[in-house]
């Protein structure tokens, strides 16, 4: 999995895990979130978006189950459930 610089005021980097269809977003604060069941075509759209921050706000935020990735010794913490 390769990280891509986001060139965005909204977040710093992003990556996509093909094997499990997961999007990873690293925010400028350093926090990393993993979004589950994220379609590859939407990752491609995010990469191509004129404004990745706007795409994130309109197409991703609040629409996917996600978790914050915290220190490995503590494990991930579920922070949102879309009810799926």
Regions of interest found by a model, annotated:
Residues 1-84:
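Acidic/histidine-enriched, beta-strand-rich ligand/metal-binding domains
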